[in-house]
């Protein structure tokens, strides 16, 4: 049974009504500093921690709860007679509930003007010590670190004469140890990223030790293949607009492959937000590769254009929009087999239409355009870490290397193709025109084979490549790849450049009479 609670929080959300409920249930309140002041101002009887310890807060508040009167009350096993005898001998009372938030270290170091001294002062010492003590003794102590836990714990207490079950206490203790581990990991990451000058702004993006924190969203029926076990974990602090922020409106549970493909689709379609090519963008993904990308004046037009690129591959694919999916788009999509459909929102009409296709998974995700801080790739015994491929080359950063200048419409098509190229597995060749992909060659070991594949895909879809723009994610190592795309119908090409045979490739472009641009930026994707 809970008789005494110690409250000390940096996040004051909900703490006053929670404390009032505890008081109404006859629970004694102990508190520290600002929390004690807030509770007293709201008419609650509260015992200051210094009154409990008979020792004043000191060292600017660095020492206030590190005392046997606190830790003895948290750690004593109620079912151990020798523990209870020791408490009686030293005049220590049990503390049955601990409500703690830690100093906001992550929020502090995220500030651009944060100094090393600011960071150090926001390393909590007493808080983690109390949390670990209470969580260790979870059979006797209820420990809360988040306002979201206040209501369910109160409800359980009211239903059980101020008692909380062992099951609940254990769940809360697990949450505490995960939280303190993440907290210490963030401190270690920050400190090991600093140089000898302790310059906050000059710290490395790649600390000497890297601690990652994720929380499990779901266990899956299987992984990439049925014989593989799998689970999905969410970043503790996902960026705005990340796939992990999805809200599933309907459909079966997401599979491992669904999530992997959905992420490719969502990241690709987000890159067209604000693009002058059209008000709406649609991306169709199959096996992590785009099989159709388009922009249009509406979601319906964008979808219809994207679908034309490769109707057969779109079967069972993942579709993403960067605008709301309305009824017109939903009506067209409902005629196709779709695994997952993603959009920032769905109209009521669209939801009604899709309700008849309950196996289709609908995901609603806020459209934020931020990129993940890091990209990761697991290798045997290690982890490759890099910044995301977030660079979008602007027109004024490009270099026209051919004798013929591109027309405005060719430039527009090349910019569109280049945006798509970043999301196609290497070697990547993409034909585009009028705000849509026409043929996509992905994942071939030679660039010329990707060029041939892209031409074949366009032909199979009945799409003309005459006058199209072509993008290559990396330089053409030989002129054969350029010859293939020009013979296929391309009138202009965009590529990074950088080959030892660039002069030969430029000469081939001039020989064919096409316009060619070097971006100076490569977009390998493996």
Curated annotation (Swiss-Prot):
Listed SUPFAM superfamilies: Cytidine deaminase-like, Methylglyoxal synthase-like
Citing just one GO molecular function, the answer is: phosphoribosylaminoimidazolecarboxamide formyltransferase activity
Mind listing the UniProt keywords for this protein, alphabetically? Hydrolase, Multifunctional enzyme, Purine biosynthesis, Transferase
Question: Which InterPro entries does the record match to this protein?
Answer: AICAR_Tfase_dup_dom_sf, Cytidine_deaminase-like, MGS-like_dom, MGS-like_dom_sf, PurH-like
A GO cellular-component term linked to this record: cytosol
Q: Where is the MGS-like domain?
A: 1-145
Question: Is Hydrolase set as a keyword in this record?
Answer: yes
Return the domain comment text from this UniProt entry: The IMP cyclohydrolase activity resides in the N-terminal region.
Under the heading NCBIfam families, the entry gives: PRK00881.1, purH
Q: Per its record, how is this protein called by name?
A: Bifunctional purine biosynthesis protein PurH
Q: Which organism is it from?
A: Polynucleobacter necessarius subsp. necessarius (strain STIR1)
